[in-house]
């Protein structure tokens, strides 16, 4: 993969209820973009995102995966997150590194608790968002119902961009609501122009009215630019929330979504990023400017028994290079990366440099953990650490074999390095060892 400049990058987190289709959407994105020649399936335990044995055994995501997609001369760093609340720490890590979010909603199940939690996270982190409705190839899926439910909850900012064309309860095409133009699917991920069927017109009018209301809430000038396809900031500001739809299994609608991500979502340099310059004790306005002193925030750690420890970083300023000597101000330690990588699931690819705003990984950093900042000794930067949910439930654990205490302690240290919502506590008063987590499922898997 080539090196991308800051304005060519989009960092997008996939959020949503468990089972809504985030991982299968990631697979469809890989396939449609040409990064994969076939789509993995959760049922076959061969998806790029769910590479962990526990994920493959259980059939759902446990940790966040980073998957880079190349589309329309841009690099889209997809952060595929778990949908179950037990693994909320992974979601919070991903959101802290994202510049925008796609909230994934099942067209069959509709708006769920996980949808609402995703929206709240976007509000908390001030993330621009889109909604993508999956499973539109399923008989009883309803795009219109999802749009109506979203509008009832979040108001007129909900802007449907597409309407499904269905025949014999199957998704066969779509109507671009903005352009009032039909497209019919010809093969997986492929489409051609078509007439708008008469039976679609009543629903089309409803969706177009919703779109017009959303746009009218802004300004007349914006309305004109919107329908002319010009660049605008209203989606970036959260005034408009586009809604797209498709089928992950058939890779239908995914190309539209990728194009909308490039068109509507901000590159990192349009977002703010501020830290503390410990050298001068002044505020450091990084703002993902590649011309400034280099700095990066470590938002995630992965400890893999086969490939070792990787620290996932988002470059906040400057350009990171493999031969850099970096400084961890929090740990008062120098770090020598040696090599830089981009990760696709658990597969590292070496790169020569990472521009401000990009997401990558560094192997085997000795003193660096999740939440740390890497910069240079001449310009020592610290960024505020992500505010993670606190573990609230616990279970007692016992070391089976005498003499294995050190082994267990080391294993727990590795687990807690990866998972910020796990916490081991030695209750000396009651002479017991406790492991805290976010729920029974979380503790069981740990």
Residue positions per predicted region:
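Structural and coupling elements of P-loop NTPases
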Residues: 1-446
């Amino acid at each position: 993969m080539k090196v991308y400049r800051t304005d060519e990058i989009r960092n997008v987190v996939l959020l949503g209820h468990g089972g809504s289709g985030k991982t299968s959407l990631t697979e469809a994105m890989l396939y449609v973009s040409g990064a994969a020649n076939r789509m993995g399936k959760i049922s076959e335990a061969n998806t790029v995102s769910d590479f962990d044995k526990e994920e493959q055994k259980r059939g759902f995501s446990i940790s966040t995966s980073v998957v880079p997609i190349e589309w329309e001369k841009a690099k889209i760093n997809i952060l595929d997150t778990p949908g179950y609340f037990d693994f909320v720490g992974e979601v919070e890590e991903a959101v802290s590194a994202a510049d925008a979010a796609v909230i994934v909603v099942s067209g069959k199940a509709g708006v769920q608790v996980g949808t609402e939690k995703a929206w709240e996270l976007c509000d908390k982190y001030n993330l621009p968002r889109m909604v993508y409705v999956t499973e539109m190839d399923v008989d009883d899926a309803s795009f219109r119902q999802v749009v109506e439910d979203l509008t009832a909850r979040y108001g007129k900012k909900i802007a449907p961009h597409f309407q499904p064309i269905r025949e014999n309860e199957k998704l066969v095409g779509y109507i671009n609501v903005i352009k009032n133009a039909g497209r019919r699917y010809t093969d997986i991920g492929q489409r051609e122009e078509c007439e708008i069927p008469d039976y679609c017109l009543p629903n089309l009018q409803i969706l177009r009215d919703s779109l017009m209301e959303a746009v009218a809430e802004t300004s007349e000038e914006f309305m004109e630019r919107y329908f002319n396809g010009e660049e605008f900031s209203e989606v970036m500001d959260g005034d408009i929330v586009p809604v797209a739809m498709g089928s992950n299994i058939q890779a239908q609608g995914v190309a539209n979504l990728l194009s909308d991500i490039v068109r509507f979502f901000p590159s990192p340099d349009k977002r703010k990023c501020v830290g503390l310059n410990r050298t001068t004790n002044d505020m450091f306005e990084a703002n993902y400017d590649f011309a400034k002193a280099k700095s990066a925030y470590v938002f995630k750690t992965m400890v893999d028994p086969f490939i070792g420890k990787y620290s996932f970083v988002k470059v906040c300023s400057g350009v990171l290079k493999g031969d850099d000597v970096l400084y961890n101000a929090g740990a008062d330690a120098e770090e020598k990366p040696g090599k830089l990588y981009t990760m696709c699931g658990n597969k590292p690819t070496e790169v020569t440099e990472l521009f401000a705003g990009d997401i990558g990984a560094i192997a085997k950093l000795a003193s660096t953990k999740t939440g740390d900042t890497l910069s240079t000794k001449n310009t020592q930067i610290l960024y505020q650490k992500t505010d993670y949910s606190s573990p609230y439930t616990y279970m007692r654990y016992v070391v089976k074999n005498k003499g294995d205490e050190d082994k267990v302690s080391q294993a727990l240290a590795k687990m807690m390095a990866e998972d910020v919502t796990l916490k081991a506590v030695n209750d000396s008063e009651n002479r017991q060892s406790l492991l805290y987590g976010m729920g029974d499922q979380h503790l069981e898997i740990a």
